[in-house]
Regions:
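A contiguous, low-structure linker/loop signature
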Residues: 74-114
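Ser/Thr/Asn(+Pro)-rich, low-complexity disordered segments
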Residues: 47-49
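Active-site loop segments of alpha/beta catalytic cores
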Residues: 1-36, 40-45, 55, 66-70, ...
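Glycine-rich, N-terminal phosphate-binding loop and its surrounding beta-alpha-beta segment
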Residues: 55-87
Length: 353
């Protein structure tokens, strides 16, 4: 296997500056996986920023990954919405159980965004970013939601989808509250770190084609997405990114309307066809993805290698570059040899120089 010609820091600095690099970058998204490998409890990984950061850094270095540690508390915004995360796992990292703050229509009608002083998730994001800064990591991510997905952290999804059909005005009311949360959070992060150090990321799991039809996506969620991006741009934010979680192949034409700035970062779930995404959204973005999660857990290194090479061949010559990544957050029970297979594919088939 060929060795790297650049360090990860050199590679990513050149990559984001549009300069030539040695090979396709490899980001593992190894968050909870790292906590589990380093034998942290769920409580330690989710809420002890020093332990979480350092666990991720050890694993990033061990697997020769690009990218940096990040705060990963699944459904963390529930804490800011007045709900509860029930933490499980004393000797390992497990997904928390969500207790939504809204149980019924009466709760929804009377729901107000809790006072900002009680936003524990946002406080933890700031704490993590400050710790990362001490370690030499600059840049802070501000969430753009989506608003509809955040409503899914206020109320259980099955209930929400019923309300989409039967109580659309109530859903619109909750989307407005989610927008309020997004924009207030952005103001706090900008004040804390400076607009020049902030970027914007958004995630769309509740808008995928298995949950909402493209028609419903356009009607229910897209107006808020456009409003939020417009208002964030008005605040001076210039760097944007998004993750298409789930199958969004029928939504791609609609996502063009966001008109993300050239060089924006778009990561893709395995259910999105790389060639189709590139054809519809164009070459003006950085793309990342999308090695299947089940393959990383159950597949052989040879299978992961082949899937990685296939993605690299499709996207390697994209104008603004391509990053090989898992389809979503790296599964906790991923085989370490399968991460090595992704690295091997980048080194052997992703060379530029």
């Amino acid at each position: 296997m060929k060795l790297d010609r650049l360090t990860s820091e050199e590679r990513m600095k050149r990559f984001y500056s549009g300069e030539k690099i040695d090979r396709v970058p490899f980001i593992s998204s190894a968050t909870m996986y790292a906590g589990n490998l380093m034998e942290l409890s769920s409580e330690e990984f989710y809420f002890d920023v020093e332990k979480s950061y350092n666990a991720q850094k050890w694993v990033i270095d061990m697997h020769c990954c690009d990218g940096n540690p990040c705060l990963d508390i699944p459904n963390g915004e529930v804490l800011d919405f007045g709900g509860e995360l029930i933490i499980r796992g004393n000797n390992c990292v497990k997904l928390p159980i969500v207790n939504h703050p809204i149980k019924n229509i009466k709760d929804a009608v009377n729901y107000k965004l809790p006072d900002v002083k009680s936003w524990e998730f946002l406080k933890k994001k700031i704490e993590f970013a400050k710790y990362a800064s001490k370690k030499g990591i600059s840049g802070v991510s501000i969430t753009a939601g989506s608003s509809f997905t955040f409503v899914g952290s206020m109320v259980e999804m099955t209930q929400l989808l019923k309300w989409v059909r039967k109580e659309p005005e109530l859903v619109e009311y909750l989307i407005g509250i989610a927008e309020e949360y997004i924009l207030k959070s952005a103001d706090i992060m900008i004040k804390e770190f400076g607009v020049e150090n902030c970027s914007v990321s958004s995630n769309y799991p509740f808008e995928n084609n298995a949950i909402l039809s493209p028609k419903m996506f356009e009607k229910i969620s897209m107006p808020s997405i456009l409003r939020v991006h417009e208002k964030l741009r008005e605040k001076g934010l210039k760097s944007f990114g998004m993750h298409l979680c789930g199958n969004h192949n029928k939504n791609l034409e609609l996502f063009r309307d966001i008109n993300l700035e050239e060089g924006s970062f778009i990561s893709l779930d395995e259910r999105n066809d790389l060639s189709m995404v590139r054809k519809i959204l164009g070459d003006k973005y950085i793309y990342a993805g999308n090695v299947p999660s089940n393959l990383l857990v159950e597949g052989s290194p040879e299978e992961v290698y082949r899937a990685s090479v296939e993605a690299i061949k499709i996207m390697k010559d994209n104008k603004h570059g391509f990053i090989l990544m898992p389809s979503c957050d790296l599964p906790i029970n991923t085989k370490p040899t399968n991460l090595f297979a992704m690295l091997k594919a980048c080194r052997e088939e992703g060379e530029y120089i």
